[in-house]
Amino acid sequence: MSPARSSDVLVIGGGIIGLVTAWRAAQRGFTTALVDPEPGGGAAQVAAGMLAAVTELHYGEETLLGLNLASARRYPDFVAELTEASGQDLGYRRCGTLAVALDADDRAHLRELHALQSRSGLESEWLTGRECRRLEPMLAPGVRGGLRVDGDHQIDPRRLAAALVTACERAGVSVHRTWAERLTVVRDRAAGVVTSEGTGLGAGQVVLAGGSLSGQLAGVPDDVLPPVRPVKGQVLRLTVPQRYAPFLNRTVRAVVRGGHLYLVPRENGELVVGATSEELGWDTTVTAGGVYELLRDAHELVPGITELPLTETRAGLRPGSPDNAPLLGPTALDGLLLATGHFRNGVLLTPVTGDAMAHVLTTGELPDEARPFSPRRFGATALTEQPA
């Protein structure tokens, strides 16, 4: 092993969560390094980029709602700052979201969601099917009703990731384009990593932000190994020809045959359709069945989609945790912190995660809004449990 090069903060993982953590750490004056063979890759290259704190509300996730809302409120300033730091457009759109129902059961479910949103103090408006189609004329005639949520926006995750890579480089982050092979532990304290090339990288504090791979790093003691599992998602990208524009004016969501479907229109004419949710380990195969189900359900929602060119099919891995919420902050191993397990909310939670990690790296304590998401909420038995 070659001699260790040291930094104040070493971030393992160059997805959007690792990148924003490294950027914020460097802004705080820490000498910062990041290890990833392909910074800006990973789940961000597949994600749709919905900033849907309101429409993503689920029963039993009210605590996560607070973190989601805190991050959503920060997005406009975050986008302005990152745009200035990187010189790049992030594809941020305040176009709103429309969640619709195609049958009576879905309509009842949306009514329940509307009631939950109201009890939680969230703004959403119930629309009839006719009102939904007035907003989005391409919707199927069978749409029974919907929820209009003007506060749920979108961003292009690929542009976000690229901008964060540039911002990190401009802020002086040392980027090592290689794999972190093993955590180095010295006298019961995380002290760095050894890369796949045999290089030792030392650090005062180590942040494990490896997404779905966070639980795979060698050398991490079992009692602090993050309980993160991969959840496969298949996503399609289509192109809207100019003669059909505007195809959709805002993000459209629905539950079709029990599965969650979304259509996210970009300003450049791209339409993102997703996503499956599959517990299949590390498999990232795009399957005929997955593509068929997405197109079938999307056609039921927006029949005209079959006229659009299909330009890309991708599958990625979401980092799921036992309670579908992120793990943020210090672990029981001194010097090792986590920023992982964001599941379906990684893009939405990027601003608040960066702020929370910068705060804890500086003070040793999580800010109030992030305290419920300490890794220490999981006991030793929970660390090895996986959902059936």
What residue spans do the PLM features occupy?
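Conserved Rossmann-like nucleotide-cofactor binding loop
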Residues: 17, 40, 213
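C-terminal catalytic lobe of FAD-dependent flavoproteins
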Residues: 302-388
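N-terminal Rossmann-like FAD-binding beta1-loop-alpha1 element of flavoenzymes
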Residues: 7-33
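Dinucleotide-binding Rossmann-like beta1-alpha1 core, especially the glycine-rich loop
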Residues: 50-131, 135, 298
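Short beta-strand to alpha-helix junction loop
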Residues: 66-69, 100-109, 147-166, 285-289
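Active-site substrate-recognition segment that forms the wall
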Residues: 23-28, 37, 49-50, 55, ...
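Helical element adjacent to the flavin cofactor pocket in flavoenzyme catalytic cores
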Residues: 147-197, 201-205
